[in-house]
Design a protein with these regions (language model features):
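Conserved functional acidic sites
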Residues: 26-232
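Secretory targeting and sorting signals
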Residues: 2-25
Length: 232
């Protein structure tokens, strides 16, 4: 793993679960809010995104909605986001994600409860589920307050189950999706996990909207592009 990645991961690891204890050198733990206003990843109640694409050669539809609920994870108030993944027209995966924002504007990922479903709607797997403060899992950085090219972070800290990482590769990327074209306005990141060393994905974010596109770069065949967005 490159030095930049190690630095980013070490920084996140040092923070730990802010609701429980302060990091070394900090006067107090970070203050978190369920009101997520980071311009590249806003999560306000009522927001809704719909994506269309392909997964392993099959039609994909992904619907993401910010609920009006707030849940406390390790004492931290978190926004609750519902993510439903449809493949070939049927619900294949349903996930609840928890996010909170610190006072500087960085968005933290506090976990997820995911369910994979068979054609009859029965749960076949919950692998990848985790919650900060439970079984040694800790929150990670999902979107920094001021992303800079070269920054790397760990989004998840649940060894053996959830270990996503990402790096900022461009702040002026161009991206075109059914919802619109954004010339030189997109933040581009690349994601990977040591649990799947042969897989690498790219994501594009636009200020005021959030994620507009995701595509597998290697190790798979998945693409999702924003087709509609409701602010609230």
């Amino acid at each position: 793993m490159c030095r930049k990645v190690l630095v980013g991961i070490a920084t996140v690891a040092a923070v730990g679960l802010g609701a429980v204890a302060a990091a070394p050198g900090q006067a107090a733990p970070p203050r978190y809010s369920a009101k997520v206003t980071n311009p590249y990843f806003p999560l306000l109640p009522g927001m809704r995104w719909e994506y269309r694409g392909v997964k392993d050669g099959r039609p994909l539809r992904d619907v993401v909605e910010v609920t009006h609920r707030i849940e406390r994870i390790g004492g931290v108030p978190c926004a609750v986001v519902l993510d439903r993944n449809y493949v070939d027209g049927r619900l294949a995966e349903s996930t609840i994600d928890w996010y909170a924002q610190d006072g500087r504007g960085t968005v933290w990922y506090f976990g997820e409860a995911t369910k994979e479903l068979d054609r009859r709607g029965r749960v076949t797997s919950t692998e990848g589920s985790w919650r900060a403060g439970t079984d040694g899992a800790r929150q990670g950085v999902f979107m920094p307050a001021h992303p800079r090219v070269g920054q790397s972070f760990a989004q998840e800290h649940y060894p053996g189950h959830a270990e996503d990482r990402f790096a900022v590769v461009s702040r002026r990327a161009t991206v075109r999706v059914p919802f619109g074209a954004f010339r030189g306005r997109a933040l581009r990141t690349e994601e990977w996990t040591p649990l799947e060393p042969g897989v690498r994905d790219a994501k594009w974010y636009v200020e005021g909207i959030g994620e507009v596109k995701e595509a597998t770069l290697k190790g798979g065949d998945e693409r999702a592009e924003l087709v509609s967005f409701r602010r609230r």
